[in-house]
A protein has these predicted regions:
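Intrinsically disordered, low-complexity regions
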Residues: 1-188
Length: 188
């Protein structure tokens, strides 16, 4: 009788094995090797017509490109993943990739695109009734506004975050956000 672990390993396609090897390389900080494995996995998944595999490998390639600051290539990968996820009706994954794209826009100085995406993300968190996600995104958006030279709008983000904390009786957090808003608007 075969070892169950070996049997399960034998049942996996080469593309799946390449993908898992890529994850291991990524975990160990070997991004060049990981990129190679994810690329091989992507080709294999495309040959197998494994839509989920294609999306997962493409997402990882996007992450690696973003880490390497190859923003255009990362956006291409993320846009492909979004297209696949939309076709599959997977709105949660689209939301996850939108957050990555917003960060990417902010990282490469495309402030207006980042701001618009973060505002949409806040709307989605509000629709999901997720105050923590809303506050975290408001905090990130405030940083983007500061980088874009829009200190008043950044202060508005902090005040909104403070009001959310106040609603949940988190007085200390609310005070901290109000202080940050005041500091942004204080004369230098």
């Amino acid at each position: 009788m075969k070892d169950l672990r070996l049997q399960k390993q034998e049942e996996k396609s080469q593309a799946r094995l390449d993908y898992e090897a890529g994850l291991e390389f990524l975990k160990n900080g070997e991004t060049a090797q990981a990129a190679n494995m994810f690329h091989n996995a992507l080709i294999g998944f495309e040959q197998e017509k494994d839509i989920n595999g294609i999306a997962n490998a493409t997402d990882k390639l996007g992450d690696i490109c973003a880490e390497r600051r190859d923003f255009d290539k990362a956006l291409q990968h993320y846009d492909r993943v979004i297209s696949i996820c939309q076709d599959q009706g997977d709105s949660i994954s689209v939301f996850s990739i939108d957050k990555k794209k917003a960060k990417l826009h902010a990282d490469c100085g495309k402030h207006e695109e980042a701001i618009n995406m973060y505002l949409d993300i806040i709307d989605q968190y509000n629709a999901m009734r997720n105050p923590q996600g809303t506050v975290d995104t408001l905090e990130t958006l405030a940083q983007v506004y500061v980088e874009a030279g829009k200190r008043e709008k950044a202060a508005d983000c902090y005040r909104t975050a403070a009001s959310i904390h106040e609603k949940y009786k988190h007085r200390q957090h609310a005070e901290d956000f109000m202080k940050r808003a005041d500091e942004l608007l204080a004369p230098v």
